[in-house]
Amino acid sequence: MKYYLNNPLSNNGIKKKLPEDCKIIDATTIDYNDFFDNLKPEDEVVMVGGDGTLNHLVNHYDCSKLKNNVYLYANGSGDDFLHDIGESKDKEVLINKYLVNLPIVHVNGKEVKYLNNMSFGLDGYCCEEADRIKAKTPKKKINYSGIAIKGLLFKFKPKHAWINVDGKEYEFDNVWLAPTMHGRYVGGGMKMAPGQDRFSDTLTLVIYTSKSKIKSLMLFPSIFKGEHVKNTDVVKQFTGKKISVRFDKPCAVQIDGDTVLDVIEYSTELK
């Protein structure tokens, strides 16, 4: 039997066309432990959703125990995971090997696994604003790039940051972004860490720092192709297994697109 675990909230509620007469289950209503532990060996599972759907899976089930093939039939608004592995939204993609050995982030007393990225600063602000828009207009398509540009110019204030990478300490002023990347992509197609490999034994921290809003704005479009890293006066990269970032003032963090508000510090580790 092939089960389709559909997240009705993904892609702003826009439904994905599924095969006729297939077994569809609402992924938001089930107990993942009961569901996966009671599958027959020949059963298969298709996750229908986006990055948030996969994040929910890895945080509600120990995927190292999986005995069945699990596929992604992508239906997200950003699909950073799909961008990173170079697959299409038009087919079911086997994903078992991507669901284990994941980094863990500690933030505001929570411990969360993530598949793609977690970001402090402007990106977290964008997710916070997107949540507000969704609350007011649930079916409205979110323009994350537009939110980011408006935030950069008018709303978001850069922070002072202290970072620690495998015991080495650094300090930066005027920090706009401080994502720690397990994959290469963030924000629905921005190639934030072009050299990151999700199968490596390290994470990549990207620090985007500049006193000038205009310079920051002019460089911003180059993130989509990963060319921003050539501007080493603005973009700093660090690789390590254990990374922490502390800001001087609280702001939002996003973890695979899910927002955590009022964060001063996060730490993340890939064991």
Task: Describe the residue ranges of each PLM region.
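ATP/NTP phosphate-donor binding region
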Residues: M1-V48, G52-K67, E87
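Catalytic core of DAGKc-family lipid kinases
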Residues: Y3-L5, L9-N11, C63-W176
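Short glycine-/acidic-enriched loop or helix-start segments at secondary-structure transitions
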Residues: I14-K15, H56-N59, F81-D84, Y125, ...
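Flexible, charged surface loops at secondary-structure boundaries
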Residues: D37-D43, K65-L66, Y170-D173, Q237-T239, ...
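Glycine-rich beta-alpha junction loops
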Residues: M118-L122, M181-R184, T209-S210
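Gly/Ser/Thr-rich active-site loops/lids in small-molecule metabolic enzymes
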Residues: A135-Y144, G188, P194-I214
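ATP/nucleoside-binding phosphotransfer catalytic cores, i.e., glycine-rich phosphate-binding loops
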Residues: G167, D197-S200, I207-K271
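Glycine-rich phosphate/pyrophosphate-binding beta-alpha loops
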Residues: L177-M192
